[in-house]
Amino acid sequence: MSAKKLTGNEIRKKFLSFYAQREHTILPSASLVPEDPTVLLTIAGMLPFKPIFLGQQPRQYPRATTSQKCIRTNDIENVGRTARHHTFFEMLGNFSFGDYFKPEAIALAWELSTKIFALPPERLVVSVFREDDEAFAIWRDQIGIPAHRIQRMDEADNFWASGPTGPCGPCSEIYYDFHPELGDDHIDLEDDTRFIEFYNLVFMQYNRDANGNLTPLENRNIDTGMGLERMAQILQKVPNNYETDLIFPIIKTASDIADIDYRKSDDKTKVSLKVIGDHVRAVANLIADGVTASNVGRGYILRRLIRRVVRHGRLIGISGEFTSKVAETAITLAEDIYPNLRERETVIKAELQREESRFLETLERGEKLLAEIMAKPETKKTQHISGEDAFKLYDTYGFPLELTQEIAEENGLTVDVSMFDQEMKLAQIRSQSAHETIDLTAQDGVKLDIDKTQFLGYTDLSSPAQVMALVGDGEQLETVQAGAQVQIVLDKTPFYAESGGQIADRGYLSGDSLVVRIEDVQKQNNIFVHFGRIERGRLQLGMTVNAQIDGTCRRRAQANHTATHLLQAALRSLVDSSISQAGSLVSFDRLRFDFNCPRGLKPEEVEQVEAQVNSWIAEAHSATVAEMPLEVAKAKGAVAMFGEKYADVVRVVDYPGVSMELCGGTHVNNTAEIGVFKIISEAGISSGVRRIEAVAGLAVLDYLKVRDAVVKELSDRFKAKPEELSERVSNLQQELKDSQKQLEALKGELAVAKSDQLLGNAETVGEFQILVAEMPGVDAEALKTAAERLQQKLDESAVVLGSAAEGKVSLVAAFSKSVNGKGLQAGKFIGGIAKICGGGGGGRPNLAQAGGRDPSKLKEALESAKEQLVDGLK
């Protein structure tokens, strides 16, 4: 019997169907961004079920089966170098929650492997935990595997635990033997050239206490995992996971862009292609699941993966941007099982292009400096890059330590990581010492043992309240006199504490001859701390005061907060349904809304969004506010802030048919109370994050007053009526544009004149004319015009021109088709030459442009170009 050759999609489908037919509920893959706060990413198929295994959540079904997307980066350096290491992989799994156990799990796994996937039994070897006699007996007596093909393994290999204490149990693994001809005399499962582990069965049957004692669990569970990529390698009979149909099409796209043949490539090139194939799957799925590149957490993992893709692309000769092209292949391969890939295609490609463009600039600077560091005599002597140099690359140029280590390793060098860490700590200390910090919390040197504050502000603007604590200068106080600043805790309060982007209420505390102005309110552990100044009288611990918020400020904040909700709803409706909030500020005079979006909004889109918000305001939608379980709120479609952790019971602010969000802020009862809404600006603030600033309600009048003053000043300056200003500015812009065109035309004519003088410098090489020359002070566009003209005049020829101006280098190559026929492509040729000047570029086979950052290297670059042309055209 021989194994059936199946596609990756067929393997996944057969696995899930097999278990579905055996009463398992098929569940969709969970997001790569887990709900478990202890891990950054979903690293295993069982992670979504961890709360059930740990007894923290009740089971909803006795059996389940999934194809779970996972990411692990702990051994990223092995990706592409071994046959089966990956960052992104799919784990096929079947799970039992207190239902079937060891005998059934083993029998099902064997039936699936030998009947459905038709793996020859004589090619399978299994492992068990050394003390698991029960599993050994099941494999031998019930399944019929010879005892010598059942390997007993140590705890490190075949015993699973969720931590030092808690549920745990032995494992059993199934291995495929690629070389049965070697016989069974010496079976070494660590020989990964012969054996591949493709199915792991975890039998959770014990609870481990703090003393290490094991006691049987009342409800025993099964957790299994089959690597989809590994099973594909086995069934498709390819030498490694990368050459399966799950990954190889991505590799093929990358190799086509690089114009190389994977099959004929050397090992180093194949490693780079495999890294690209693996990492592109990872980054596409991460972005699809809402991760954006950053310098912290999972955002840093994404950024690191993208940068590795870019760098390995350069290693195989790709000089321009390419990541979005290979991502398209990754999306096409997996969109049927993970539809959010196609839904978020625009976001994925935009994020890749943005990160790639930025990193290419970083690479150009960093690689040049790193090359200089590696060329230093002391580096060559010690075969070691100092921590100081590595940190300078990181701190000054944004060059990642991991990348420095990779390049160093490729050149036979090491990096002093411990010294790098010391430099990092020193930098942090320097940064901290450059700032003074003031702790404004009531717990500054004071431990307050009091009950949480009762918040009344959703319904009441004033309320009597008892003073529970007074804090000043780091001490608890009993009495505070007029003129003093103090932090006050009340038993209940109508004051909204700053949270969720909304600033705190302002107002007063009052009593007999007492007035306390409240300037801020902060909240810690549900204790509201009022920051106030005693304007008159004396405030005492335990006294009763009247807490009164400023109604005008509250109404302004409410209008701006509700307008923020309407703004998000309009953006999701009119621009992109995947838009999510990245931050906000709701104050009395304005609002600011930050949101994840891969592109800037068009002017007409801004107008449409503003019009939609004003339309909803005019329609007078009433608010419905309710508390409900989080899952119920999500099921109703309530919008939550991505990455935010919510309590089991949440507050939902709903303007039916318009906006429904999880929110603890204060809002208008009816949208008509807002009055009017005006967008002031829309701009990018960081990679993939946009910001809209706007005003609502009475704040719009303040904004219009300022704008009218500006218009009046411009009218006076241009001596024009306000309605004539646009035409007057347009005329000035057109005059400037015409002048610039005339200047460019003159530059072009000058370049042509100069180029005609160079014709006599052309040299004959075989049947071709070659001309390599510098044209000082000529810009890139004029240089291109000159190169094309010279190539046409010289006919069968190769022309390379260079120019240095304003600290930059411009290079152009123009080749005739006959030169292309000799294997010389202008795009690749000029890209290689530009590297000498610390730059890069590319283009078509017959015409290409490049740039560089080091004018001092231009002469060397042109000399190299001439030598290469002579050698290539002989």
From Swiss-Prot:
Compartments reported by the entry: Cytoplasm
Role summary: Catalyzes the attachment of alanine to tRNA(Ala) in a two-step reaction: alanine is first activated by ATP to form Ala-AMP and then transferred to the acceptor end of tRNA(Ala). Also edits incorrectly charged Ser-tRNA(Ala) and Gly-tRNA(Ala) via its editing domain.
SUPFAM superfamilies per UniProt: Class II aaRS and biotin synthetases (SSF55681), Putative anticodon-binding domain of alanyl-tRNA synthetase (AlaRS) (SSF101353), ThrRS/AlaRS common domain (SSF55186), Translation proteins (SSF50447)
GO cellular component: cytosol
GO molecular function: alanine-tRNA ligase activity; aminoacyl-tRNA deacylase activity; ATP binding; tRNA binding; zinc ion binding
The protein's required cofactors: Zn(2+)
Family listed: Belongs to the class-II aminoacyl-tRNA synthetase family.
Gene that this polypeptide is encoded by: alaS
Transmembrane segments: none
NCBIfam families from the UniProt entry: alaS (TIGR00344)
Keyword list, A-Z: Aminoacyl-tRNA synthetase, ATP-binding, Cytoplasm, Ligase, Metal-binding, Nucleotide-binding, Protein biosynthesis, RNA-binding, tRNA-binding, Zinc
Record remark on domains: Consists of three domains; the N-terminal catalytic domain, the editing domain and the C-terminal C-Ala domain. The editing domain removes incorrectly charged amino acids, while the C-Ala domain, along with tRNA(Ala), serves as a bridge to cooperatively bring together the editing and aminoacylation centers thus stimulating deacylation of misacylated tRNAs.
Keyword Ribosomal protein: no
Top-tier EC class: ligase
Record-level GO BP terms: alanyl-tRNA aminoacylation
EC annotation from Swiss-Prot or TrEMBL: 6.1.1.7
Residues the entry annotates as binding Zn(2+): H561, H565, C663, H667
Protein's recorded name: Alanine--tRNA ligase
Cofactor note: Binds 1 zinc ion per subunit.
One Pfam family named in its UniProt record: DHHA1
Catalysed conversion reaction: tRNA(Ala) + L-alanine + ATP = L-alanyl-tRNA(Ala) + AMP + diphosphate
